[in-house]
């Protein structure tokens, strides 16, 4: 699947990093929604319908894990990548055990980020394909 088919929501309260992430992802061919807070992300998620969310861990108001928890309740298959300048092994273990797809510490290499994005979207695409195949199999059963 080409990158242009994918929508990525980026959430960070640092405007400079938000611009940088948006530029890098857009240059890689993704459609990007850049939002400054978890609250704004929740308000826009149903409209933008992202295939992936990348969020800062520590933000004023709703932090990245609270955002993840809300998104995960609504759409468990939606992959989320957490970015943080305050990374620790216990935080990473907690995040991944709760279902976060990836966890990157700032500063991060753009190549590492794009690799995580590609992996997350590949998994999402494979899950969608399996669901489609199951739907087709069900449909065939109904018409036989």
Where in this protein do the model-derived segments appear?
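Short hydrophobic/Thr-rich beta-strand motif most characteristic of the beta2 strand and flanking loop
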Residues: 29-36, 44
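Acidic catalytic/metal-coordinating carboxylates
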Residues: 36-40, 63-66
